[in-house]
UniProtKB/Swiss-Prot annotation:
The modification S-nitrosocysteine is found at residue 121. S-nitrosylation of Cys-121 inactivates the enzyme. Binds 2 magnesium ions per subunit. The magnesium ions interact primarily with the substrate. Mg(2+) binds at residue 24. Its EC number is 2.5.1.6. It comes from the Eukaryota. The gene is Mat1a. This is S-adenosylmethionine synthase isoform type-1. Residues 114-126 are annotated as: Flexible loop. Keywords: ATP-binding, Disulfide bond, Magnesium, Metal-binding, Nucleotide-binding, One-carbon metabolism, Potassium, S-nitrosylation, Transferase.
Length: 396
C-alpha cells in the first residue's frame, strides 16, 4: 500500500491499484532555469543568422555573475552580452534589491569552436539526412492518455501553477512576487490495466520569492485563491487535500543569490516529472545534431502519435545512438500492457512511419528554427505550439 512516509495508513489508498505520484516544476527565476533560458537564447541568436550553427552552450550563474562556456561553430555574429542581459531582463531580475540585476551583472564568455574530431565524424562532407549523431546516448519519449496533452497530470499542473504565478507577477496583480518559484503536486491515481487514472490531488506545495512587504498569511491566501483555484480543476480538490504554501515561511533571497545555477540540472522538470524514464542528457543550449535533444523530441513525437492513434493508452519509447552513426542503434517500445498489439507489431508501425536519423528529425520537426528559448521553461512537452506535439497520422 502507498502512503505517507510516517507510515500512517491512508485509507483512500487501500483500494487495489491505488497509488500516489509526485512531480515538481520551477519558475523562470529559478537559478538553474535562468541558465537554461540563457543557453537557449544563445542557441536562438545563432540560428537566426546561421541555421546550420553547431552549438553546445552551457551557462553558470551566481550573485552578480553569468558565465557562458562551451563550443560553438557558426558564421553568426552574436553579441553575447546583449543576449544574456536581455534574457535576464525578460525573466524579471532588473534590480539589485531582487538579488540580481541585468544591468550590473558581470558576463564572462568562455566559448570555443566545436572539436574538429567531432565535426569530421558527425556532419562534415555529409548530406543532411546522413548527418551522424553528435554523441552516443539513450533517449526516452513518454505519453499517457490521462490528459488531453498526453502528459502526466502531476507535471501538467506543476507547470501551470508556475505559469500562473509568473502571469500574476508580470501583470502587477501580485506586485510582491519576485521571479523565483517552485511548485510540487502529488496526485492519487488508480491503475487501469496498465493505464493510470487521476483520482484526486493529495498535496500541493508552492514556494515563491517575495519582497519584504508582504505577510505570510497574505501570501498563503493569494496562492490558494488566485493561483491554485485558477489553475487546478475543482474536481481534483477536496477537504483532505494538503496545502504547503510558503512552507519555509520566508523566501526573500532567491534566484542566483540564493543558489548557484547551472544549465541542464532540471531534466526531470523539462520532461515527464519522473514518469517514464530519462537517459540523462539535458536539452538547453544544444543544436539538433545533439541527439540528447532532437531524439528526445522525436521519441516524444512517436509516443504521442501512438497514443493519439489509439494503439495504446500509455507508452514509453527508447532510442539509442552512437557518435557519427546516423541510424539509431535500437528502438524499444513499452506499453505497460495497454495495447491490443504486441510491442513487436508496434515497433513495425514506428519503423514504417518514422525515420529517426538526426538529419531527418531536423527536417520533420523543423529544428533549425530559433524556437528554443520558449522551450526552456514550463516543460518541453505537452505544449501545442511545438512540432513534436502534433501527432503524426500513422499508416498501419
Amino acid at each position: 500500500m502507498n502512503g505517507p512516509v510516517d507510515g500512517l495508513c491512508d485509507h483512500s489508498l487501500s483500494e487495489e491499484g491505488a497509488f500516489m505520484f509526485t512531480s515538481e516544476s520551477v519558475g523562470e527565476g529559478h537559478p538553474d532555469k535562468i541558465c537554461d533560458q540563457i543557453s537557449d537564447a544563445v542557441l536562438d541568436a545563432h540560428l537566426k543568422q546561421d541555421p546550420n550553427a553547431k552549438v553546445a552552450c552551457e551557462t553558470v550563474c551566481k550573485t552578480g555573475m553569468v558565465l557562458l562556456c562551451g563550443e560553438i561553430t557558426s558564421v553568426a555574429m552574436v553579441d553575447y552580452q546583449r543576449v544574456v542581459r536581455d534574457t535576464i531582463k525578460h525573466i524579471g531580475y532588473d534590480d539589485s534589491a531582487k538579488g540580481f540585476d541585468f544591468k550590473t551583472c558581470n558576463v564572462l564568455v568562455a566559448l570555443e569552436q566545436q572539436s574538429p574530431d567531432i565535426a569530421q565524424c558527425v556532419h562534415l562532407d555529409r548530406n543532411e539526412e546522413d548527418v551522424g549523431a553528435g554523441d552516443q546516448g539513450l533517449m526516452f519519449g513518454y505519453a499517457t492518455d490521462e490528459t488531453e496533452e498526453c502528459m502526466p497530470l502531476t507535471i501538467v499542473l506543476a507547470h501551470k501553477l508556475n505559469t500562473r504565478i509568473a502571469d500574476l507577477r508580470r501583470s502587477g496583480v501580485l506586485p510582491w512576487l519576485r521571479p523565483d518559484s517552485k511548485t510540487q503536486v502529488t496526485v492519487q491515481y488508480m491503475q487501469d490495466n496498465g493505464a493510470v487514472i487521476p483520482v484526486r490531488i493529495h498535496t500541493i506545495v508552492i514556494s515563491v520569492q517575495h519582497n519584504e512587504d508582504i505577510t505570510l498569511e497574505a501570501m498563503q491566501e493569494a496562492l490558494k485563491e488566485q493561483v491554485i483555484k485558477a489553475v487546478v480543476p475543482a474536481k481534483y480538490l477536496d477537504e483532505d487535500t494538503v496545502y504547503h504554501l510558503q512552507p519555509s515561511g520566508r523566501f526573500v533571497i532567491g534566484g542566483p543569490q540564493g543558489d548557484a545555477g547551472v544549465t541542464g540540472r532540471k531534466i526531470i522538470v523539462d520532461t515527464y516529472g519522473g514518469w517514464g524514464a530519462h537517459g540523462g542528457g539535458a536539452f538547453s543550449g544544444k543544436d539538433y545534431t545533439k541527439v540528447d535533444r532532437s531524439a528526445a523530441y522525436a521519441a516524444r513525437w512517436v509516443a504521442k502519435s501512438l497514443v493519439k492513434a489509439g494503439l495504446c493508452r500509455r507508452v514509453l519509447v527508447q532510442v539509442s545512438y552512437a557518435i557519427g552513426v546516423a541510424e539509431p542503434l535500437s528502438i524499444s517500445i513499452f506499453t505497460y500492457g495497454t495495447s491490443n498489439k504486441t510491442e513487436r507489431e508496434l515497433l513495425e508501425v514506428v519503423n514504417k512511419n518514422f525515420d529517426l536519423r538526426p538529419g531527418v528529425i531536423v527536417r520533420d520537426l523543423d529544428l533549425k528554427k530559433p524556437i528554443y528559448q520558449k522551450t526552456a521553461c514550463y516543460g518541453h512537452f505537452g505544449r501545442s505550439e511545438f512540432p513534436w506535439e502534433v501527432p503524426k497520422k500513422l499508416v498501419f
